[in-house]
Amino acid sequence: MTKVQNIKRGLAAVGATVVLVGAAHAVDPGFPAPIGDPSVVPAGAKLDRVFDGGCILTEGVAAGHDGMIYFSDITFTKFCKDASGKFGQAGNIWKHNPKTGETTVFRSPSGMSNGIKFDRDGNMVAALGADFGGQMLVRTDMKTGKSYILTGLFDGKPYNALNDLTIDEKGRIYFTDPRYLGHEPIFQDGFAAYRLDPDGTVTRVAADCGKCNGILISPDQKTMYIISNDNGWFAFENLKQGEKTLQSAHLLQAYDVDANGNLSNRRVLIDYGKLDKPCSGPDGMVADTEGNIWMASRCEHRPGIQVLTPQGKELAYISTGKEMPTNVGFGRGADSNLLWLTSGKSLYKIRVGKNGYQLP
C-alpha cells in the first residue's frame, strides 16, 4: 500500500469507468536512464510497460512456477466503479503471459489481495486486505484452483488488513498487518508482523516495526527486512480535500532471524524522514541471489527502484519518473534477471544484471 497524497494524485486520471484490457506493450512513457553500478543495472537498460489496464494500484507482482506473472489490482471501492459509476469493483488478480504479452484476469473478486508469493510447491500465497476484502492469508493450489484460509484471526480477532509476505526455506510465512483504508472495524491492538508456521501456529514476531508494510527474508535466512510506511491515517479515502495527516516513521529496518524464526536486534538501515530531502518511505521489495535488496521507493522527489546492499547502501537506481512504484518481483529460469514492477495502473519489466532469489 501507499501514502494518501500519492494515491489522490492519481485519482483525477482514473474516472468512473475502468476498462479491463489484455493488451500487449503500451506506449513507453520515457523514463530516465538507470544510474549506478552497471553490473547491477546495465547501461542502456530500459523499463518497458507491458500492461496499463488496472484501476488505481497494481501491487504484489510475483512469477509463478508456470512462467506466468501474477499481480494484484487493488480496486479501492470508493473510486473504482462499474460503467454506471454505482458499484465498486471487488479487486482483481491479473495473469500476464511474458511470451504472448497477453494479460487476463486470473481471479475476481480477489479478496483485495495485495502481496503475492509462491511457495516451494508452486502454490500461490496472497495477503488479503480490507475495504470489503478478506483480511486473511490465503493459499491457492495452482493445479486445482482451490483456495485455503491459512489464517484469518489472531487471538480470535480479525486482522487489520494484510499487506505483504515473505516465505523462508522452512516453509514459514511472515506477513505484515497495517491498515490504510477500509470501513471495517479494527480489532487488533496495533500494527505488527506475524509468522505462520507449517503446523498452522501464528506468532506475532514484531510489534515494533511501525506501520509495517513490505517484508523480506534474506537469501541466507539470517535477516528480516521490514518497511515502515506510515501515512498517519487508517482510512485515507475519507480525508477531505486539503486535509493533511501527521506522518510518522518511514523506515527500512532489519532484524536478526534465529533458527526458530523469531526476530530480534532491530536496527534502522534508512530513515527516510531524516534524509537531506525527507520523503515517504518505500513499499515492496525482493532480493537477488547475492542478498542485495531491490525496493520500490516512493520518495516524492525520486520515485523508482532502489538497489541496496544488505547494509542499506545504494548500488543502483531505476527511475520511474513521476510514477510511484509499489512492488517488485523477479522472473524465473532464463528470466531470473528480468525484474517486474507494479506502479499505478501498470505492470513494467526491465532486464537487470543480477538474478533474483527464489525458494530452492
List PLM regions with ranges:
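A general, composition-driven signal for non-globular sequence regions
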Residues: 2-3, 19, 190
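Bacterial N-terminal signal peptides
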Residues: 12-22
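Sequence-structural signature of mature extracellular/luminal beta-sheet repeat domains
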Residues: 26-360
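Bacterial N-terminal signal peptides that target proteins for export
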Residues: 2-14
